[in-house]
Every structure is written in structure tokens, then in C-alpha cells.
């Protein structure tokens, strides 16, 4: 039975890069992994495949939206480490619903019966707006993971995600595994001071601290995971947190919780206390 993860976070903070590197770390530890990009930008799997692959929506358009005419090969591409990759895609700008597209991708995967062949399935989901469609992966997930940076906007989005997880947990099995601190900069960004305080208040923990490092940015633009970059101390520093997260997720009983969201004023107090 697959371990299903829903990875959320505010747009533009490195969520997809982090997810791809977690997928790579899991695969290198022997897991059979599927990563599903659930963002209209359809670039979630780029570090794994080195290409902007065809989306589910593009594939459906080619067969006039007849699901039964699609095969796995039409929508799944195998990338680094044997990780299978899929991109849901999105509707044309100004029309349709991106969340609906996520739901259609999930429906197609169910019809193809691919779930049971994987050890781990990761949904990489846009987390700025957790509407019904974009929250759909929480219906299937064992755990949610939030990617966040040490700033107000990211923490505000993380709190909204905690609200969605809390609400979904009343009907589904999903729990919050924890928060991954991304782009951690102890010189300019305060490290993880605000994230640590926020995590304590909502009843979760920081799973790992991914450093703010130029090498991670370079790997992203090169269409590679950090594990494919040249060996050296900098690479070791960057891949360490991804391996820590993979080890945690592959443990038999990873700790988790139903988060307790805080009020907006509480977030302002956290941020204001560190200015």
C-alpha cells in the first residue's frame, strides 16, 4: 500500500524544488516513487526529468477528453532515480478552475490503477489558495507536509494550510507530518526563529532546515536534482536535509498531528516580536 503525501506551500518559495529533491532522496533509498505536480505552471517535475513534460490536460485535449483513450505512457515520464513524474497542468489563463484540473488528474490516475505499484506518491500542490480542488490531494493523503520560509507571507499561507488540514482530518485520515524550513539564511533571514515559534503554536515540528544556497538554485535551472550536482562539501550540505526528510517519511511510524491553526493577529505577534 502506497504512502501518500500532499506537499503544500506558498508559491515562489522553492516548494517544487524541495519536493523533487525529496522524491529523489526517497528513490535513492530504494522506494518506488511517483511525483504529481498540481500547479498550472507544470514545472514541479522539471528537476527530475529535465523537461517540461506534457500535462494531463494537454493529453486529454488530444483525445477530446475521453479518459479511456489515455495510457500511462501518455502522461507519466520517468526521471532521475527512476522517479515517475506526472503534471496535472491547468486551464487557459482567465478561464476554468485549476483546482478542478487537479481533481481530473486524480480521477485519471484512479482509472489507470497506478496507485498500488508505488511505495510513495507525492502530490506537489499550489498552497496560496486552498480551495476545494487544490485541497483534493488531502482526501487521499496519509500525511501533509508544508514547505515554508521564515517570513510573514509564507507563515500566513502555512496557517491557512493548517486550517485546511484540520478541516479535512475530520473526514479523512490525513495528518500534518511537519514543516520543512526552506531557504534558511541565518545571516539575513533570521534562520528559523519565526517558523519555530509558529510550529510550536500549531502543534507540529520542523522536519528539516534546507539552506539558502546558490547551488540549489543552479540545480533547479539546470533541470537537475541536487543529487546530480558535482560532489563536494556544498552538495553534502544541501542534500543532507532532503535525506533527513526521506528517512523520516520511510520510518514505520512517522510522528504526525492534527494542527491547531492560530489567529491572524497571532501571526502578526510572531513576526512583530522578531523585528
Curated annotation (Swiss-Prot):
Q: Carries keyword Oxidoreductase?
A: yes
Catalytic activity, reaction form: chlorophyllide a + oxidized 2[4Fe-4S]-[ferredoxin] + 2 ADP + 2 phosphate = protochlorophyllide a + reduced 2[4Fe-4S]-[ferredoxin] + 2 ATP + 2 H2O
User: In the Enzyme Commission scheme, what number(s) does this protein have?
Assistant: 1.3.7.7
Annotated membrane-spanning segments are: none
Q: How is the cofactor bound?
A: Binds 1 [4Fe-4S] cluster per dimer.
Pfam families attached here? Fer4_NifH
Q: What GO biological process terms does the UniProt entry carry, in alphabetical order?
A: light-independent bacteriochlorophyll biosynthetic process; photosynthesis, dark reaction
Principal EC category: oxidoreductase
Annotated positions binding Mg(2+): 16
Instruction: Enumerate the UniProt keywords alphabetically.
Output: 4Fe-4S, ATP-binding, Bacteriochlorophyll biosynthesis, Chlorophyll biosynthesis, Iron, Iron-sulfur, Magnesium, Metal-binding, Nucleotide-binding, Oxidoreductase, Photosynthesis
UniProt: ATP binding residues: 12-17, 41, 182-183
- Quick check: keyword Iron-sulfur in the entry? yes
Cofactor requirement: [4Fe-4S] cluster
One MF term in the entry's GO annotations:
oxidoreductase activity, acting on iron-sulfur proteins as donors
Where [4Fe-4S] cluster binds, per the record, is at 97, 131
Cite the PANTHER family for this sequence: LIGHT-INDEPENDENT PROTOCHLOROPHYLLIDE REDUCTASE IRON-SULFUR ATP-BINDING PROTEIN (PTHR42864:SF2)
Q: What does this protein do?
A: Component of the dark-operative protochlorophyllide reductase (DPOR) that uses Mg-ATP and reduced ferredoxin to reduce ring D of protochlorophyllide (Pchlide) to form chlorophyllide a (Chlide). This reaction is light-independent. The L component serves as a unique electron donor to the NB-component of the complex, and binds Mg-ATP.
- Spell out the subunit comment: Homodimer. Protochlorophyllide reductase is composed of three subunits; BchL, BchN and BchB.
Q: What is this protein called?
A: Light-independent protochlorophyllide reductase iron-sulfur ATP-binding protein
The organism named in the record is: Chlorobium phaeobacteroides (strain BS1)
